[in-house]
Design a protein with these regions (language model features):
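Accessory, often C-terminal, charged low-complexity segments
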Residues: 1-156
């Protein structure tokens, strides 16, 4: 499992490792690019060609984190798409969100109805919308950044 995560990270990250450290750091620090994780792309270097490549954040996170996926379900809340990834020991929630229009209390109820919150939770944008008292969850974007940076030496 760990070997596959390392192999995937190495292959995937090699697509953009030639970009400058400043650009890589900026990419990893801008939370707004993850507000719609279902329409995410990167400008990458493939065979000396600069191209835009769609990135599946759900699959990338599952693979890099080594999540043993037991099920995936798609739900909609207030016309926004949510994907719940049910892992053996964790639940990962990916969602489109706009914190200005989100009813946080209703979303919290929706999340509790759709997953086992006794498992370890990862949610994109959790720090933007919920307090730690409302829902104990890890910010998936911070975790994804850590996994990506682990595989690429962006300070070189």
């Amino acid at each position: 499992k760990e070997h596959m995560s390392e192999l995937y990270a190495s292959k995937y990250l090699s697509l953009y490792k030639d970009f400058t450290a400043r650009e890589s750091k900026a990419l990893l620090m801008d939370d707004s690019i993850f507000f719609n994780p279902f329409d995410f792309s990167l400008i990458v270097n493939i065979d000396s060609q600069i191209v835009e490549k769609k990135m599946d954040l759900v699959e990338t996170f599952n693979t890099l984190k080594g999540i043993e996926v037991e099920g995936i379900k798609l739900r909609y809340f207030e016309d926004k798409k949510y994907i719940f990834v049910d892992g053996k020991n964790e639940v990962v929630i990916w969602r489109e969100f706009d914190k200005e229009s989100l009813d946080i209390a209703k979303e919290l109820d929706f999340i509790k109805e759709n997953c086992d919150i006794t498992k370890e939770l990862y949610i994109n944008g959790i720090t933007q919308t919920h307090t730690k008292k409302e829902l104990v969850a890890k910010e998936s974007i911070f975790e994804l950044r850590a996994l990506l940076v682990e595989g690429v030496k962006i300070d070189e």
